[in-house]
Amino acid sequence: MYDKERGLYIAHCPNGALSINGKMANRHGLIAGATGTGKTVTLQVMAESFCQAGVPCFMADMKGDLSGISQVGKMSGFIEKRLPEFFPVDSSQLTVDSDAASPQLSTFNSQLFQACPVRFFDVYGEQGHPMRATVSQMGPQLLSRLMGLNETQDGVLHIVFRIADDLAQENPNMLLLDLKDLRAMLDYVSQHAKEYQVKYGNVSAASVGAIQRALLQLEAQGADKFFGEPSFDIYDLMQTDGGKGIMNVLAADKLMMQPKLYSTFLLWLLSELYSTLPEVGDMEMPKLVFFFDEAHMLFTDTSKALLDKIEQVIRLIRSKGVGIYFITQSPTDIPEIVLGQLGNRVQHALRAYTPKDQKAVKTAADTFRPNPAFKTDETIMNLETGEALVSFLDEKGAPTVVERAKILFPLSQIGAISEGQRLDIIKQSRIYGKYDTMIDRESAFEVLLKQMEEQALAAAAEKEEKEVEKEKEKGGKAKKGIMSKVLKAVTTAVTSTMAAIVGTWVSDKISGKKTKSRKSATEKIVKNATSSVTRTISRDILGNLVK
């Protein structure tokens, strides 16, 4: 809980209240412990405190339990027994509550328990407002991790994004918004690989095929619902309601079944916050607190380049007013370069059954500033549920001496809410309907499809034009061939007829016969020539028909 006297009150030890310093809340934190030791309740208590201080939070709800933060908590026997530890009360103020099994402080009870304003989100759009990002926003580095690409395939994906960016300079609609845009761009680059080889590098068909197969797997996981528009506006995570910070709860029970998609999505959110928010330095309170549950998923199978980027984002995002709190089983799940930046720590019990477990306990103990009152490593193994070793940063940013403490109980409901309650909260949200309908505007897929259609039409027209020219050429040759044959036939007929006439005339002169008239000779020449032409044309036509 939060009040002016104790600040962000999280736990209580024999020396008094243990609270997070608001100015140091953006220095990040860690909640660690074995399964069943109370990590989720601690997360809920922290989130409530930030909420009451007017700080919005984002958290992933793995089992649905965190949805209870939207409802007012109730007194229970367990809480009643622990109440005096956290809130010393004068017994004379006790009054009987008819709904309780024992006397309660009714007035105090009604003021103490309270709900938080909540918005539910869901990547799949089933249990909350949809959350989407475009392929371009996700970028090749995160997409490569998401698809599990090797170094060569990762290089090809970077080339495809670079070509898409360059093409977008010529055509602003050449955008990579959803998975079909990326698939179309991969096909396009593969088909024009030789053209781009000199400027961008080699793009092999095998690498493109591997990326296409990885895209199919992504679609099978439901990632196609995540990529697209309208893309999520991160400022919708940074709102208040009645002076309280809104708790943004991501339904992750289905999402966590795809660890790569879950961790990459949250990493994208962090990257968007880092790249979008302005520098503000240290503030009285953070602008946003980001709880990253199952944090080990973020660092599993992560390349050195991406790990460096994660470390950079975590190191620099605090100057944007954002605090990141990792939740995991053991501090050893977090790389040292990241672990060293987590100043506010709550360590629940760890079990040490194997040498590896014992080493993890020692590592966890070594991250705390020692307390001479107890041995840290032994205490970690003997903590009860709801107990933890706690160390927060002081006003100067130095870690305080570790204390064995009891975590405050949540003031909101512990456990999941009903589907009806969830639906009511979703419908009452100020952003209800903003992200519900996916928009599919013109982008790379449509542009490239249009280009392909135009090229296909142009190719068909060119082919048809060539066929027409070919037919014309063929027809011209045929006509020329017939005329040549006709001319030859006429020449032959005339020559042979003239020869015959001349021969007859010479013979008649010698024999003394009377020669036929010139007209008769001419008629004979014409008649023979005509007959020859007719026979030639007929033979040519019949020959073509037979062919």
State the predicted function of each range:
Residues 47-57, 64-77, 84-312, 338, ...:
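P-loop NTPase motor domains
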Residues 39:
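Conserved lysine of the Walker
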Residues 6, 104, 129-136, 147, ...:
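Conserved P-loop NTPase motor module
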Residues 31, 35, 302, 331:
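The conserved Walker
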Residues 483-510, 518-545:
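Membrane-active amphipathic alpha-helices enriched in small hydrophobic residues
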Residues 13-22, 238:
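Pre-Walker A adenine-sensing motif
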Residues 45-47, 70-90, 312-398:
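Conserved ATP-driven motor cores of ASCE-family P-loop NTPases powering translocation/secretion/packaging/pilus
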Residues 1-17:
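N-terminal pre-Walker A segment at the start of P-loop NTPase domains
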